[in-house]
Amino acid sequence: MFTMKKSLLLLFFLGTISMSLCEEKRDADEEETEGEAKMEDIKRAEAVPPGFTPFRKP
């Protein structure tokens, strides 16, 4: 029973470290591509005609 608890604790600890490293990498990637994403949003926004609201009920 003790070895099973020890193994589960080790897996939890390693999983937590792995998740934090993934978050750091994702945050760094988001900072890199922030400018590119804004340009994409601007390009997409131009395609919608003025006054168009897709969620308006008749």
UniProtKB/Swiss-Prot annotation:
Tissue specificity field: Expressed by the skin glands.
Signal peptide: 1-22
Gene Ontology terms: cellular component: extracellular region
Biased composition annotated in UniProt, kind: Basic and acidic residues: 35-46
Keywords, alphabetical: Amphibian defense peptide, Cleavage on pair of basic residues, Secreted, Signal, Vasoactive, Vasodilator
Biological process annotations from GO: defense response; positive regulation of muscle contraction; vasodilation
Highest rank taxon of the organism: Eukaryota
Propeptide residue range(s): 23-43
Cellular compartments annotated: Secreted
InterPro entries named among the record's database cross-references: Frog_antimicrobial_propeptide (IPR004275)
Region (Disordered): 25-58
One Pfam family it belongs to: FSAP_sig_propep
Function: Induces contraction of intestinal smooth muscle in isolated guinea pig ileum. May induce relaxation of arterial smooth muscle. May target bradykinin receptors (BDKRB). Lacks antibacterial activity against the Gram-positive bacterium S.aureus and the Gram-negative bacteria E.coli and B.dysenteria, and antifungal activity against C.albicans.
Record-stated family: Belongs to the bradykinin family.
Protein name: Ranakinin-N
